[in-house]
Design a protein with these regions (language model features):
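Histidine- and acidic-residue-rich, metal-dependent catalytic cores
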Residues: 1-141
Length: 141
């Protein structure tokens, strides 16, 4: 995929490495979801599902805060922003957009097709694979 012309600018070795490092943070916003919803062993109600969907923005917001605090520390100490912070910027994008759908029916913004950042599209595929191959509290074993 990285050798295809249309992905040349987005899939360099360094961007792939950052995505791999950032991917585990994609659901970090679930820490803000009440356990009664997150661990519910049955189908969520519409209201519960609306709350669950907020994990994308909660996660992106938490990562944004970490970026801002890190940059503030670097600026205060007159240090240049390290390249390692780039993975947090990628993590913010992945956390925010990994539930967008190609057809525009996803959340939080209803983005579609190329509007969805490539890193989030790739995370979405991995997230679906994980969902269908992993036991969850709400799935029968």
């Amino acid at each position: 995929m990285k050798n295809k012309e249309k992905f040349q600018g987005e899939l360099s070795e360094s961007s792939i490495a950052r995505m791999i490092k950032a991917a585990p943070l994609h659901d970090i916003g679930k820490i803000g979801i009440p356990d009664r919803i997150l661990l519910k062993p049955a189908k969520l109600t519409n209201d519960e599902f609306e709350i669950m969907k907020t994990h994308t923005l909660l996660g992106a917001g938490a990562i944004r805060k970490a970026i801002e605090q890190s940059v503030e520390i670097y600026n205060k100490n007159e240090l240049s922003k390290p390249l390692s912070l780039l993975f947090l910027e990628d993590a913010e994008v992945i956390a925010k957009f990994h539930h967008e759908k190609w057809n525009g029916q996803g959340h939080p913004y209803g983005l579609k097709e190329q509007e969805i950042p490539l890193s989030a599209r790739l995370m979405s595929v991995a997230d679906v694979f994980d969902a269908v191959t992993t036991n969850r509290v709400y799935k029968r074993k």
